């Protein structure tokens, strides 16, 4: 039986969105759509991240108010370099329609600021569809 997959561009801005003390706010929220998704299937979020270089836990990620994983840090990395990361999620987390993605700022354990500022860009959701 063939498997069908679709992709949703959640956010695709060249410079990315800034999250943290210097950002818009410490939680970035955006709506994306996964019409026809297979609830028993698999999905993953893919994004590029830059500047998340401090110590401590990464940035918390939620879809539809459910924790799905963390954006991992790259301690000591060059803050000018972009890194690709993915978070695997269950198709059951996604709605057959509008979904809410939340990315929380990561705590800064080694500086004066409350958060470790970072940028996200090229955010995609790949998901299985009902054939």
Residue spans for each PLM region:
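Beta-strand-rich recognition domains
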Residues: 1-131
């Amino acid at each position: 039986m063939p498997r069908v997959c679709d992709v949703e561009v959640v956010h695709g801005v060249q410079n990315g969105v800034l999250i943290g003390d210097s950002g818009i706010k410490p939680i970035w929220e955006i709506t994306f759509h996964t019409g026809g998704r297979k609830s028993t299937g698999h999905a993953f979020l893919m994004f590029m991240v830059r500047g998340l270089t401090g110590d401590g836990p990464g940035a918390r990620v939620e879809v539809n108010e459910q924790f799905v994983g963390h954006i991992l840090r790259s301690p000591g990395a060059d803050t000018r370099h972009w890194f690709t990361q993915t978070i695997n999620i269950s198709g059951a987390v996604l709605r057959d329609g509008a979904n809410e993605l939340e990315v929380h700022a990561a705590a800064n354990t080694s500086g004066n600021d409350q958060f470790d500022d970072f940028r996200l860009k090229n955010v995609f959701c790949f998901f299985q569809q009902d054939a």
